[in-house]
Amino acid sequence: MPGKIAVEVAYALPEKQYLQRVTLQEGATVEEAIRASGLLELRTDIDLTKNKVGIYSRPAKLSDTVHDGDRVEIYRPLIADPKELRRQRAEKSANK
């Protein structure tokens, strides 16, 4: 009989951070942890088909298994291309 595990689910916005602790059955997936957290109901801007997820800052799939003590993170989409931002900063500093 599988035991219970405790997992945190995190979602951060510039103005607010959400951190929900959930208890799941061993063998639960990242997606099950997110759904159990209630964040999908709280934040309608989270779309699991678009938002990337991870466990402790490492990319993960929704089907990956979570372990006791894991922190599942839901990432926001990038607003700007990091390469483009670096290029713009380099041009700006070159023009000084």
Curated annotation (Swiss-Prot):
Output the InterPro entries linked to this UniProt entry.
Mopterin_synth/thiamin_S_b, RnfH, RnfH_sf
Q: Which family does it belong to?
A: Belongs to the UPF0125 (RnfH) family.
Name-wise, this protein is Protein RnfH
